[in-house]
Amino acid sequence: MAYHLFKDYDKTNVLIGDGTGYATKGAKYFVAECCEYKDHFLWYHPDYAYINNIEMDHVDYFKSMEQYEQSFEKYANQAKKAIVIWGDDPHLPHLNYTKRVVKFGVKDGNDIQAKNVINNEKGLSFDVYIYGDLFGHFTLPFYGMHTLYNTLGVITLGYLEGMDFDYMQSQLSTFKGTKRRYVVKEVGNNVYVDDYAHHPTAIKYVIEETRTRFPGKQIVAVYQPDRYSRGLRFAKDYARIMDTVDHPYFVDFPKNAPKEPGIDIDVSVITKNLPRSKVVTEDEAGAKELAQYDNAVFLFMSPKDIYKLEDLVIKEKEKA
């Protein structure tokens, strides 16, 4: 989203976390998506360190929330111009910063604040106030509060680089989303969604967006955990969040999931906390089980290739 906002403002290069990107000579801006895993992001010394949130993850490397926060604090303070943070986060505002901090959010006390937020099946609309003054009213084809926060953060970056309201409203309204983030297929009266979500909070956001975007449809959610340490650490959280959908399903860890010392589990570490859930396989049998539902939104969530099961379900329903 940040790249999309900047690319028509001035020449902009981009590097996304999956290794893809775009570059041209003489670009003024370089937007890079960096990851905290194994402190990889400490190699970066950006002009702006833009941090959406802090929530414990990558538990095979980070052993405590204190260690996690220390890494983010160090990364943030490597910024040259400013640190841009979600001011409503329970952790970010309390870190020790040595550079200018600009906070965005919906709560009072943020430098960039969204007010009068409307979030429904038509999209998002909200007023943006900057240091107390109305900047403009945004109407965008996005869904969910998590998307509002992402958008507000990008608006903050644009403001810091001198963009005006008209440019940002126009440019953001044409943003089509990111790879493997809420990719929608509508076939008949059913909706199929592929999403990279792998942290419990990300799954929660996907479910919330679905309820907003497709009210009245039942939700069939399928999640495949990818790392044993993450599955073990967040087992109860996965179960609690998946319990909010009509029909919760899980797929076992992939066969190529990296082995981790001292951890010998399967997906039952999660499902035992949610007895009404079912386990399906990524084959025709699994597709038949899921295809029994109609007028539904099917959520397929995992960093792995669970979208292949989505394709099988669509084919199975076409047989009916």
Provide a role label for each language-model segment:
Residues H45-E55, G216-V222:
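Inter-motif core of Ras-like GTPase G domains
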Residues K28-Y29, D47, K81, D246, ...:
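Conserved acidic residues
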Residues M1-A2:
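Glycine-rich phosphate-binding P-loop
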Residues Y97-R100, D133, T156-T178, V184-A320:
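ATP-dependent carboxylate-amine ligase
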Residues Y29-Y37, Y192-H198:
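Switch II (G3) loop of P-loop NTPases
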Residues D10-G21:
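Short beta-strand-centered segment that lines the nucleotide-binding/catalytic pocket of NTP-utilizing
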Residues T24, W43, A76, M242-D243, ...:
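A short, aliphatic-rich alpha-helical micro-motif
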Residues K7-D8, Y48-Y192, S268-S277, L290-D294:
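Acidic, Mg2+-coordinating active-site environments of NTP-dependent enzymes
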